Amino acid sequence: MAETYDFLFKFLVIGSAGTGKSCLLHQFIENKFKQDSNHTIGVEFGSRVVNVGGKTVKLQIWDTAGQERFRSVTRSYYRGAAGALLVYDITSRETYNSLAAWLTDARTLASPNIVVILCGNKKDLDPEREVTFLEASRFAQENELMFLETSALTGENVEEAFLKCARTILNKIDSGELDPERMGSGIQYGDASLRQLRQPRSAQAVAPQPCGC
Amino acid sequence: MSMALGPGADSPKTEEARASPTPGPGTPTGTPTRTPSRTAPGALTAKPPLAPKPGTTVASGVTARVAAVTAGQVTSGHGAAAATSASTTQALEDPSGPGPGPSGTCEALVAVVTVTPAPEPAENSQDLGSTSSLGPGISGPRGQAPDTLSYLDSVSLMSGTLESLADDVSSMGSDSEINGLALRKTDKYGFLGGSQYSGSLESSIPVDVARQRELKWLEMFSNWDKWLSRRFQKVKLRCRKGIPSSLRAKAWQYLSNSKELLEQNPGKFEELERAPGDPKWLDVIEKDLHRQFPFHEMFAARGGHGQQDLYRILKAYTIYRPDEGYCQAQAPVAAVLLMHMPAEQAFWCLVQICDKYLPGYYSAGLEAIQLDGEIFFALLRRASPLAHRHLRRQRIDPVLYMTEWFMCIFARTLPWASVLRVWDMFFCEGVKIIFRVALVLLRHTLGSVEKLRSCQGMYETMEQLRNLPPQCMQEDFLVHEVTTLPVTEALIERENTAQLKKWRETRGELQYRPSRRLHGSRAIHEERRRQQPPLGPSSSLLSLPGLKSRGSRAAGGAPSPPPPARRASAGPAPGPVVTAEGLHPSLPSPTGNSTPLGSSKETRKQEKERQKQEKEREKERQKQEKEREKQEKERQKWEKEQEKERQKQEKKAQGRKLSLRRKADGPPGPQDGGDRSSASEARQDAYF
C-alpha cells in the first residue's frame, strides 16, 4: 500500500497454449526464468512498478490460460485492460495462425483502443523457427501492433516489451487519445497523481455500485 | 519379507519395459515411440541451457530406476500409515504378484525405499505383532541411502527441477525449513519441493487407529454393494475421517465405481492406447506433460514414467471421448490419480470423474464450470454474505477465482494432506464437497470486516484469493468446516435449476448439454442399479440430455454385459474380479486381510473370534444405524427450519439496504426446487 505511482495500467498476456505467457510474466516480475511451472488454468497475475519517461507506473498484469476452450472463461479477465502482450511461439506456426482470433477477442472484449504488442516468444530457439521475423512484422503492421521477438528464457526483450507497451499508453494519454477517466480504460490514477488532481477517483469508485446487476 | 520383495524385484522389469522406447509386451506401438521422440524436441521448452542437461539418452537409461524408486516412494508418500500397514497390503498383494504390476509393486516397495524422515522403521520394530513388516522395515534404512542418492542424481541430470528448487524456496515463505540437503528429500507424499511440499508438521494418525481403519475399510470392500446401499452414512463418515493411505487408491476406485468399468472393459485401455489419436490433442497434451506437479518426484523427470503414463491416459481419453477431447485441466486430475494407481486404473477413474462427477467441466466452452460459478456465487450469499457483497461490488466474477479450484478439485490449491482428504470426501459425496470447500475458503478469506480491509480493490482481492490463509487450508480445520457447512445436494440442485433458468434467459440455450451430474458414490451406485437390471431403454428416465453421450459411450463398449450375476451376489466378495486389478488378491474377508499382522496360527484364532464379534457388532451397528438415521432426519428437519429462519433474517438485514436487489434475486424459496420430486429432495437432504 505504501507504494506510490502516477498511473496504474491493467495488462493482459494472451496467446495460444504453451507459448510461454506465464514465463514471460515471471521473467518480467522476478527477473528469472521459471523452469518448472504449471500450465495456467484460469488466471495468474503479477504486478510491478516501473519507471517510464519520468512517470511511475504500476503494471497489473493478468496472465491467462491459453487453451482454446478456456477462452469463454478468460474473457472475463479482459474487461478494462489498457494493454496486452499478444504472444506466439516462433517455433510453432499454429500458435502464429491463431493470432488473429486472439486479437479480435482483445479488441472486442477489452477495448478497441487497447494497446497491443505482438511478442514472438522463444527467440532463443532460433534453429527451430517456423515463423520468420519478417512475416510476423508484416502481420503486426497490418494490424497496427508493435512487435518484438522475445525470450522468456534469456530475458531478451521481455522488459522491453512491457515497457514499450506502457510507454505507448502514456503517450496516448499525453496526446489526449486515451482518457484515463473514462470507465473501462484500464487506467487509473495512482496516489501520486491523485494529490495533484482533483480526486477523479471518487467518481470511479462509486460508479460500480449502482449497477447491482 | 520375501513376500514383500517378490513384486518389488519385479518392478524394475515392468517399469523398464515401459520406459524403454521399445514397446513392452502389452504396450501399444503407437504411444511409447511417440512419447520419447516428442520429448526429445520436447526439450522444446528446454532451451539451450537446459538441453544439455536432459540429455535424453541418459534419461531413458535411468528412467527405469527412477520409475522403480518412484513407485515405492509414491506409495510411501501415503504416509506413516502406509508404511506401517504396508504389511497388510503387501501380503494381500503378494499372491497377485504377476498381476498388473505397478500398484502391487508400489506397495511392496514401500518399506524398502522410504526416504521419508518418518519414524516408520521404529514403529515397525516396536510392533511385535507384525513380523512380516519388520523385514522390509529393517532392510529399509540399509538399502535406502545409495538408492536415494543415485535416484536423485539421475533426476537432476534429467530435469532442472532440483536446481530450480533452490530458487523456488524463496517463494515458499521465509520461514521455510527447506534448505541445502533437506531439499533432496521428498516429503511423505513424494514432493521434492514447491508450494505443496509438506514439512514435518503433519499430524499423523496413531498406528493402531490407522490399522483399525484399514480393517474397517477392508470389511467394507468385501461387502461393498451392501455397504453402499444400506449403510452409506457410515461409508460417508469414514471417508470424511480420511481413507487410510494404503487403501486410498482402491477406495477411490470403489467409490467412483471405476473398478467395475475396468472389469467390464478388459483390454479397452490398451486398445485406446494403440489407436492413433488426433494430433490436435496430442500436441497439446505433450506440451503439458512436464507441467504437472513438476515438484513431485513422479513427474519431475522429463519423459519419466510419470509423464509417460500421463500421456497414455490423457491420450486414451481423447479417443474414448472424441467429442470431448482434451482439456488442460484434466492433466492435474489425471496426475493425482497416477500418484496412486497404475495407468489403466487411473484412466477409468478419470473417466468416472469426467462423466459422472463433473460432467461438462472439461468440455469445449466450459459452460458447466461457468454455471457452477454462478451456483457457487448464489450459495456464497448464504454462506458468507459479506464475502458475497464484497465480490459483487468489486465485480469479480466467480470464474476469476474458482475455475482452477473446481476443475482441478483443489489439487493445485491446498496443502497435499488436505487435497487427499478433500478427494476422499469428493469421491464419496461428489461435487457438493467442492462447493463446500470453496465456500469455506472464501468465508475465511473474505468473510469478515477486518479481512476485507486489506482487499480494497479488485486486484488486492484477487491477490488475496490467490494466497489463501494457510490456517483455513489446514487439513483438520478444513475438513471440520466442510463437514459442518449446511450445503446439501438438494440445495445445489435447486440453485442449479435457478441458475440454468437465468442462463437461458440471458445467454440462451446451453451449447453443450452434459449428462446429469451424479452426486457421489451412492448416486452412481443407484444409477448402476437402475441400468443394470434388464431395464432396457427406460433408463432414459435418468438423463434426457445425457442420452446421446451415453449412447456414444455404449458404442465405446462401456455398459451392460456382465453384471446381472454380480448384482445378485451383492453380498460376499467381488473377490476374483478384483484380483484382476492387482490390488486385492485373495478373497478379502476382512479378517483374512489381517493375517500378516501377526504370526499365522494366533491370528487365525483371533480372526475367528473377531469374526464372531464382528457379526454381533454388525447387528448392533445396524440397529444403531437405523436409529441414527431417524435422528439424522429429525436433525435435518430442524436444520431446514433453521435455515429458513436464517434466510428470513438475512433478507431482513439485506432488505434494509438492498430491497431492490432482493426482489430481483428472489428468495431461493421452495418453488425453485418444486420441479424436482420432493421425495428425492428429502432423500438428498438426508445425505448431508
UniProtKB/Swiss-Prot annotation, chain A:
Q: Where is this motif: Switch 1?
A: 39-44
Q: Please state the protein's primary subcellular location.
A: membrane
Identify its protein family. Answer: Belongs to the small GTPase superfamily. Rab family.
Please provide, alphabetically and separated by semicolons, the GO molecular function terms listed in this UniProt record: G protein activity; GTP binding; GTPase activity
UniProt keyword terms in alphabetical order: Acetylation, Cell membrane, Endosome, GTP-binding, Hydrolase, Lipoprotein, Magnesium, Membrane, Metal-binding, Methylation, Nucleotide-binding, Phosphoprotein, Prenylation, Protein transport, Transport
Give the source species.
Homo sapiens
Q: What name appears for this protein in its UniProt entry? A: Ras-related protein Rab-4B
Q: Which cofactor does it need?
A: Mg(2+)
What domain of life is recorded for the organism?
A: Eukaryota
